[in-house]
């Protein structure tokens, strides 16, 4: 390789120094924008029929990706007045583009759309986001954005190194409200793998479709984030290269899913909403949501605590049983104490999380691995999802054989009557760093249904049960019993061992 002349090498060095100096010094400042509120509930349109069926709070579990996709699309297609969508991740894949296509159609009908998305996974998507937000009826905001934009996640991270503390705080909330009548709340992001459509690996997740008086609280939650000073209009962050926005752009990428989920007539929509409200579970509901930081997201005093406090209180008040499903399970010291106290009171604690092979974040599994013995010793029952679960076909579109299953759901069932479902995992990142949202429902019938839906996930053909035998961990399932983690390879175990020895637990 030829050497650069001294002058050229000097310019390269100076350029790199300037690059890193710029990355370390610049800071994005929050905005002051006029406050906006949710559009009042529509009195017309297919969604309004739910008010004639159920005036009290009602809930329906969205157990499978197909159910979740069908009801989301139906809500978007049924809206006539407003649509508010808050999410952590929205990928440019089949499902992601299907949502964009249907949202554009809604906007063309005159629906006022507000989209609020966290900036964690938006690298390379500024132009498609700008084209979506260019529609006169669509407002698109990015929460806690990276000030220096890039199409590469790596270069974007380097460019913004000086703001690591601020950018470490993320909005993990997931919520959709349509026409002020219904909402969807839970764990799903907007991408193929959350709806069973990824060709390689998909998630088992859980959400609630809800209606009733709680909708006004959910709208207020959305407004609080929408009006936060760290919610930036996308046009403040990047410049649109082409003004044309076309449904065809997104429809072409979503063709396969579009034929699977065709649009319905207004009469079909109204009938579907009437029936789901009639068949729903009824129960008192209370929203728990982390407040957006008052000043800068990195401020210790502003760290979210509302959802964490409620989760810990729920377990702390349990009298007989706690069933906790969490994609990532890394108990904080406070949560560990709460679980220990529950077991000491005679409460049965049953936990379901990812195994080494089903986890999409190996570092999270590695840190959790350090806590397994402690959880077992305090008396908890610990289960891990099998990536090759026999019943994974329930959550995955065909063909299933070559597809892996992972867990992404986040919910608790306490004493067979209280249900807490939302976006929060039982880990330090959800409990102490990110903002989260969750709905607490007091309903024995809903709890019974969720327990029935979850039983299949705990079954030995679908999950490993962990034991501590003479100081060694043992994984047991329907067809085998092993003393090493069920990794896909020895190298995966080596990677996990490496991560387990890094000082990263507080960030997981």
Language-model regions, residue ranges each:
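Exposed boundary/loop context
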Residues: 8, 17-19, 180
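N-terminal Sec-pathway targeting helices
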Residues: 5-12
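Bacterial N-terminal signal peptides
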Residues: 13-23
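Charged, low-complexity intrinsically disordered terminal segments
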Residues: 2-5, 25-174, 178-508
